[in-house]
Protein backbone atom coordinates (compact mmCIF):
# COMPACT_ATOMS: atom_id res chain seq x y z
CA UNK A 1 0.00 0.00 0.00
CA UNK A 2 1.03 3.61 -0.60
CA UNK A 3 -0.24 6.83 0.95
CA UNK A 4 1.13 9.07 -1.80
CA UNK A 5 2.41 8.34 -5.31
CA UNK A 6 4.29 11.10 -7.13
CA UNK A 7 4.69 10.85 -10.91
CA UNK A 8 7.78 12.83 -11.92
CA UNK A 9 8.82 11.23 -15.20
CA UNK A 10 8.37 12.84 -18.65
CA UNK A 11 4.74 13.45 -19.58
CA UNK A 12 4.05 10.34 -21.66
CA UNK A 13 5.61 8.09 -19.03
CA UNK A 14 3.49 9.76 -16.35
CA UNK A 15 0.34 9.11 -18.36
CA UNK A 16 1.24 5.47 -18.91
CA UNK A 17 1.94 4.98 -15.22
CA UNK A 18 -1.34 6.67 -14.28
CA UNK A 19 -3.26 4.19 -16.43
CA UNK A 20 -1.45 1.32 -14.73
CA UNK A 21 -2.20 2.72 -11.28
CA UNK A 22 -5.90 3.02 -12.13
CA UNK A 23 -5.98 -0.71 -12.86
CA UNK A 24 -4.61 -1.47 -9.40
CA UNK A 25 -7.92 -1.59 -7.52
CA UNK A 26 -6.08 -2.72 -4.40
CA UNK A 27 -4.52 0.77 -4.25
CA UNK A 28 -6.96 2.46 -1.88
CA UNK A 29 -7.09 5.85 -0.17
CA UNK A 30 -3.99 6.91 -2.07
CA UNK A 31 -3.18 10.41 -3.31
CA UNK A 32 -1.60 10.27 -6.77
CA UNK A 33 -0.12 13.47 -8.13
CA UNK A 34 2.09 14.42 -11.04
CA UNK A 35 4.64 17.20 -11.32
CA UNK A 36 4.52 17.79 -15.08
CA UNK A 37 4.76 21.23 -16.70
CA UNK A 38 1.54 20.83 -18.73
CA UNK A 39 -1.70 20.01 -16.95
CA UNK A 40 -4.62 19.72 -19.38
CA UNK A 41 -3.71 16.46 -21.19
CA UNK A 42 -3.13 14.36 -18.06
CA UNK A 43 -6.16 15.91 -16.32
CA UNK A 44 -8.37 14.87 -19.25
CA UNK A 45 -6.88 11.38 -19.16
CA UNK A 46 -7.52 11.00 -15.43
CA UNK A 47 -11.18 11.97 -15.91
CA UNK A 48 -11.63 8.80 -17.99
CA UNK A 49 -10.04 6.50 -15.40
CA UNK A 50 -11.55 4.71 -12.42
CA UNK A 51 -9.24 4.35 -9.44
CA UNK A 52 -9.41 2.15 -6.37
CA UNK A 53 -11.66 3.14 -3.49
CA UNK A 54 -10.62 6.49 -2.01
CA UNK A 55 -7.73 6.91 -4.45
CA UNK A 56 -7.59 10.24 -6.27
CA UNK A 57 -5.39 11.85 -8.90
CA UNK A 58 -4.36 15.48 -8.50
CA UNK A 59 -2.61 17.43 -11.29
CA UNK A 60 0.15 19.59 -9.77
CA UNK A 61 3.27 21.43 -10.88
CA UNK A 62 6.01 22.62 -8.51
CA UNK A 63 7.83 25.67 -9.84
CA UNK A 64 11.24 24.36 -8.92
CA UNK A 65 13.74 22.22 -10.73
CA UNK A 66 17.12 21.98 -12.35
CA UNK A 67 18.34 21.81 -15.91
CA UNK A 68 20.16 18.59 -15.00
CA UNK A 69 18.27 15.32 -14.54
CA UNK A 70 19.02 12.36 -12.28
CA UNK A 71 19.11 11.58 -8.58
CA UNK A 72 22.71 12.77 -8.35
CA UNK A 73 21.45 16.30 -9.05
CA UNK A 74 18.75 16.25 -6.36
CA UNK A 75 18.59 18.89 -3.61
CA UNK A 76 16.90 18.61 -0.22
CA UNK A 77 15.71 22.24 -0.26
CA UNK A 78 14.68 22.34 -3.91
CA UNK A 79 11.06 23.32 -3.21
CA UNK A 80 11.57 25.72 -0.31
CA UNK A 81 9.70 29.02 -0.90
CA UNK A 82 8.69 28.01 -4.42
CA UNK A 83 5.12 27.96 -5.71
CA UNK A 84 3.48 24.57 -6.16
CA UNK A 85 0.57 24.83 -8.60
CA UNK A 86 -2.41 22.61 -7.72
CA UNK A 87 -5.52 21.89 -9.79
CA UNK A 88 -8.29 23.79 -8.02
CA UNK A 89 -11.07 21.71 -9.61
CA UNK A 90 -10.26 18.47 -7.75
CA UNK A 91 -12.29 17.95 -4.59
CA UNK A 92 -10.02 15.87 -2.39
CA UNK A 93 -11.18 13.66 0.43
CA UNK A 94 -10.33 14.88 3.91
CA UNK A 95 -7.59 12.24 4.16
CA UNK A 96 -5.96 13.14 0.85
CA UNK A 97 -6.27 16.85 1.60
CA UNK A 98 -4.33 16.26 4.81
CA UNK A 99 -1.62 14.36 2.93
CA UNK A 100 -1.24 17.19 0.42
CA UNK A 101 -1.03 19.78 3.19
CA UNK A 102 1.74 18.00 5.06
CA UNK A 103 3.69 17.06 1.95
CA UNK A 104 3.91 20.64 0.68
CA UNK A 105 4.50 21.97 4.20
CA UNK A 106 7.39 19.59 4.91
CA UNK A 107 8.96 20.42 1.54
CA UNK A 108 8.63 24.14 2.25
CA UNK A 109 6.59 24.80 -0.89
CA UNK A 110 3.82 27.38 -1.35
CA UNK A 111 0.57 25.75 -2.58
CA UNK A 112 -1.05 27.85 -5.33
CA UNK A 113 -4.47 26.76 -6.60
CA UNK A 114 -5.23 27.36 -10.27
CA UNK A 115 -7.32 25.94 -13.11
CA UNK A 116 -5.50 23.87 -15.71
CA UNK A 117 -6.07 25.99 -18.85
CA UNK A 118 -4.80 29.11 -17.09
CA UNK A 119 -1.82 27.18 -15.73
CA UNK A 120 -0.78 26.02 -19.19
CA UNK A 121 -1.15 29.53 -20.61
CA UNK A 122 0.94 31.02 -17.81
CA UNK A 123 3.63 28.36 -18.20
CA UNK A 124 3.97 29.14 -21.90
CA UNK A 125 4.97 32.68 -20.93
CA UNK A 126 7.01 32.28 -17.74
CA UNK A 127 8.62 28.88 -18.30
CA UNK A 128 8.31 27.43 -21.80
CA UNK A 129 9.15 30.64 -23.69
CA UNK A 130 12.31 31.30 -21.62
CA UNK A 131 13.38 27.71 -22.28
CA UNK A 132 13.03 28.16 -26.03
CA UNK A 133 14.78 31.54 -26.01
CA UNK A 134 17.69 29.98 -24.12
CA UNK A 135 17.81 27.11 -26.61
CA UNK A 136 17.75 29.46 -29.61
CA UNK A 137 20.47 31.63 -28.10
CA UNK A 138 22.55 28.54 -27.34
CA UNK A 139 22.36 27.53 -30.98
CA UNK A 140 23.29 31.00 -32.21
CA UNK A 141 26.32 31.74 -30.03
CA UNK A 142 29.65 30.29 -31.13
CA UNK A 143 30.42 27.63 -28.47
CA UNK A 144 34.10 28.63 -28.52
CA UNK A 145 33.14 32.10 -27.28
CA UNK A 146 31.09 30.95 -24.28
CA UNK A 147 34.14 30.49 -21.97
CA UNK A 148 35.03 34.13 -22.68
CA UNK A 149 31.59 35.40 -21.71
CA UNK A 150 30.51 36.83 -18.39
CA UNK A 151 27.80 35.50 -16.04
CA UNK A 152 25.02 37.26 -17.97
CA UNK A 153 25.28 35.03 -21.03
CA UNK A 154 25.89 31.91 -18.97
CA UNK A 155 22.75 32.57 -16.95
CA UNK A 156 20.74 32.95 -20.13
CA UNK A 157 22.17 29.72 -21.56
CA UNK A 158 21.56 27.62 -18.43
CA UNK A 159 18.16 26.35 -19.55
CA UNK A 160 19.58 25.29 -22.92
CA UNK A 161 21.20 22.37 -21.09
CA UNK A 162 17.84 20.87 -20.12
CA UNK A 163 17.11 17.34 -21.46
CA UNK A 164 15.45 17.55 -24.87
CA UNK A 165 13.47 14.38 -24.15
CA UNK A 166 11.54 16.33 -21.51
CA UNK A 167 11.08 19.55 -23.46
CA UNK A 168 10.02 17.92 -26.71
CA UNK A 169 6.95 16.50 -24.93
CA UNK A 170 6.19 19.80 -23.20
CA UNK A 171 6.28 21.64 -26.53
CA UNK A 172 3.99 19.08 -28.15
CA UNK A 173 1.47 19.06 -25.30
CA UNK A 174 1.32 22.85 -24.89
CA UNK A 175 1.85 23.75 -28.53
CA UNK A 176 -1.03 26.22 -28.93
CA UNK A 177 -0.09 28.40 -25.95
CA UNK A 178 3.63 28.22 -26.77
CA UNK A 179 3.08 29.33 -30.38
CA UNK A 180 1.02 32.26 -29.11
CA UNK A 181 3.81 33.28 -26.72
CA UNK A 182 6.46 32.90 -29.45
CA UNK A 183 4.50 35.08 -31.88
CA UNK A 184 4.13 37.82 -29.27
CA UNK A 185 7.86 37.66 -28.54
CA UNK A 186 8.60 37.78 -32.28
CA UNK A 187 6.46 40.91 -32.64
CA UNK A 188 8.18 42.61 -29.70
CA UNK A 189 11.60 41.62 -31.05
CA UNK A 190 10.63 43.17 -34.39
CA UNK A 191 9.63 46.41 -32.66
CA UNK A 192 12.97 46.59 -30.84
CA UNK A 193 14.83 45.89 -34.10
CA UNK A 194 13.01 48.72 -35.90
CA UNK A 195 13.64 51.12 -32.99
CA UNK A 196 17.36 50.39 -33.11
CA UNK A 197 17.42 50.74 -36.92
CA UNK A 198 15.71 54.14 -36.76
CA UNK A 199 17.67 55.41 -33.76
CA UNK A 200 14.69 55.53 -31.39
CA UNK A 201 15.33 55.20 -27.65
CA UNK A 202 14.35 51.83 -26.24
Role assignments for model-derived ranges:
Residues 72-78, 168-169:
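Short, flexible, solvent-exposed loop/turn segments with mixed acidic/basic and small polar residues
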Amino acid sequence: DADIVVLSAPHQANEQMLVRLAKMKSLRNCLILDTGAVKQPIAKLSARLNFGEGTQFLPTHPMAGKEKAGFENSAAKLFVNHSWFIDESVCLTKLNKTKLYWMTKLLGAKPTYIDNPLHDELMSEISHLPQLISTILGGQVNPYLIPLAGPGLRSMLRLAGSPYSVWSEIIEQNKTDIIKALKLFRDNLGKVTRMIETGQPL
